[in-house]
């Protein structure tokens, strides 16, 4: 009975993830999305999404050429397999990446803009004794009190590093990328029982221009992703050995991840589902341990949030506001093209900044959107395709956009300007467009193949599935999708490995 249930659950998840990846692969092969950021003479910034058809024959050809080269390289290096698997290569790669990242950060010195700048300004206000952002109805923290974890991090960095706090944050992001690479590698080893696959994933992550350029984005994205991946790895280790160290690390890392970025709740839920699924097939003691870890994660998240709120209230002298309800983001996500358009804030403002009244107004707005979709099904299909295209089909995932209009680099200005605005940036975007298709093809092949998969191998895939479903309703943005794209890299590596192994 238990075995039947496990087979049924695994098949359902496999079909759903494969279907989503197949859809995204088709989007990638036949179309692409670019983000244009323009600034007029008054300093106003306009962001627009441009949808274009891809040369599908060239995209398919690139996938085939990549597969052929992979087969050739695999054949040529078969005799040097031990060297490829050597951890020394990974250490060297990490050191090179660390030095390159430090050089990049200290060279370009890009200060934060947009929301990261607003969060850091709130931190500066707290240190200056100005707490208006928490009490003024138009204040940033009055609307978004869940950002207080990020604010406290900025407060700590400003207290230690002063005006160079933004550089310290970028160094933390650099270290976070290394943690992400290592955790994805270790999770891959647990899921596929292959050290060589884990090393390939590590190299693939640090070679991604997306992760490199995201180091300047001071919004907690990389730090939160590093923490939740650390939590997932610790959860897997706990199910194997039941050590209290893994219990504590998993609970604390989950709490920190959600505090820094609430979107990390999606991979956290995937991890919780894994724990519940695993305990159904284990012995009685292991069931108790797994369920205990689930409660431990919940407790850590609740206590962590309360602790952050308490510390913020202590520093600001103002109670934590209820803030803008999450329902407002859904209302905004279902209006227009689904990107940020001010609908969420307007609903909050028009309801008199009353959270309960804003929920009712947002729900009315949501029902209106759903009714319109039902009555105009052709429009809904177009809207659904375009919303997912602008999120998942920008191969740069906003890594170029987030670095634009942030002042001139202090060193290597011509190179950096060419990367962001010139032909070098266009070439990078085209390369990433091809790489994205290769990644999605490998991941799709893995999930559509009939080979038996361990329960551990489902965690990141279910997290990506959750991210896809969540952002069908939530505010759209390719920068929100970037973490899920990185979670697909292990499946891409394993998928291509399986495919090449069958073509010996």
Predicted regions and their residues:
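Transmembrane-helix signature of polytopic, membrane-embedded enzymes
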Residues: 184-207, 455-460
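Extracytoplasmic catalytic/substrate-binding loops of multi-pass membrane glycan-assembly enzymes
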Residues: 108-124, 128-164, 320-323, 360-362, ...
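Transmembrane-helix motifs of polytopic, lipid-linked glycan transferases
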Residues: 171-192, 230, 442-446
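Membrane-proximal stem/loop segments at transmembrane-domain junctions that anchor or position
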Residues: 309-409
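Start-transfer (signal-anchor) and selected internal transmembrane alpha helices
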Residues: 1-103, 289-299
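Loop-to-helix entry region of an early transmembrane alpha helix in multi-pass inner-membrane enzymes
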Residues: 144, 148, 152, 160-179, ...
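Short acidic/glycine- and proline-prone juxtamembrane loop motifs at membrane-interface regions
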Residues: 210-224
């Amino acid at each position: 009975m238990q075995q039947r249930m496990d087979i049924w659950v695994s098949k359902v998840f496999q079909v759903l993830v494969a279907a989503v990846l197949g859809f995204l692969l088709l989007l990638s092969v036949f179309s692409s999305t670019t983000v244009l950021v323009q600034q007029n003479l008054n300093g106003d910034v306009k962001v627009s999404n441009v949808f274009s058809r891809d040369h599908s024959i060239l995209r398919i050809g690139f996938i085939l050429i990549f597969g052929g080269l992979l087969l050739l390289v695999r054949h040529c290096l078969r005799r040097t397999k031990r060297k490829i698997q050597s951890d020394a290569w990974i250490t060297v790669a990490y050191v090179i990446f660390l030095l390159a990242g430090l050089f990049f950060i200290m060279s370009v010195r890009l200060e934060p803009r947009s929301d990261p700048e607003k969060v850091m300004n709130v931190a500066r206000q707290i240190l200056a004794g100005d707490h208006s952002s928490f009490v003024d109805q138009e204040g940033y923290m009055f609307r978004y009190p869940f950002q207080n974890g990020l604010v406290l991090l900025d407060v700590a960095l400003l207290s230690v590093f002063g005006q160079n706090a933004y550089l310290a944050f970028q160094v933390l992001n650099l270290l976070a990328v290394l943690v992400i690479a290592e955790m994805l590698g270790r999770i891959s080893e647990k899921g596929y029982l292959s050290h060589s696959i884990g090393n390939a994933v590590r190299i693939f992550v640090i070679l991604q221009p997306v992760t490199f350029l995201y180091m300047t984005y001071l919004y907690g994205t990389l730090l939160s992703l590093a923490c939740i991946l650390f939590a997932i790895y610790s959860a897997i280790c706990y199910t194997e050995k039941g050590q209290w160290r893994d219990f504590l690390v998993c609970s604390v890392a989950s709490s920190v991840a959600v505090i820094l970025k609430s979107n990390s709740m999606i991979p956290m839920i995937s991890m919780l589902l894994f724990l519940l699924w695993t305990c159904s097939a284990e012995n009685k003691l292991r069931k108790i341990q797994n369920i205990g870890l689930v409660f431990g994660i919940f407790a850590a998240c609740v206590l962590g949030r309360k602790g952050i709120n308490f510390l913020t209230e202590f520093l600001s002298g103002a109670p934590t506001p209820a803030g803008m309800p999450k329902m407002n983001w859904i209302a905004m996500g279902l209006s227009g093209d689904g990107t940020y358009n001010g609908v969420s804030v307007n609903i909050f403002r028009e309801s008199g900044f009353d959270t309960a009244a804003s929920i009712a107004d947002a729900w009315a707005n949501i029902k209106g959107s759903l009714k319109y979709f039902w009555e105009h099904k052709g429009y809904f299909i177009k809207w659904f395709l375009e919303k997912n295209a602008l999120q998942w089909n920008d191969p740069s995932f906003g890594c170029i956009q987030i670095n634009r209009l942030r002042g001139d680099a202090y060193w290597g200005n011509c190179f950096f300007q060419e990367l962001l605005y010139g032909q070098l940036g266009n070439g990078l975007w085209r390369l990433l467009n091809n790489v994205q298709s290769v990644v999605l093809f490998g991941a799709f092949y893995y999930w559509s193949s009939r080979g038996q998969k361990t329960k551990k191998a489902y965690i990141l895939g279910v997290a990506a599935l959750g991210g896809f479903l969540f952002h069908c309703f939530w505010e759209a943005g390719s920068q929100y999708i970037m973490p899920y794209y990185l979670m697909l890299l292990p499946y891409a590596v394993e998928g291509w490995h399986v495919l090449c192994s069958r073509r010996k």
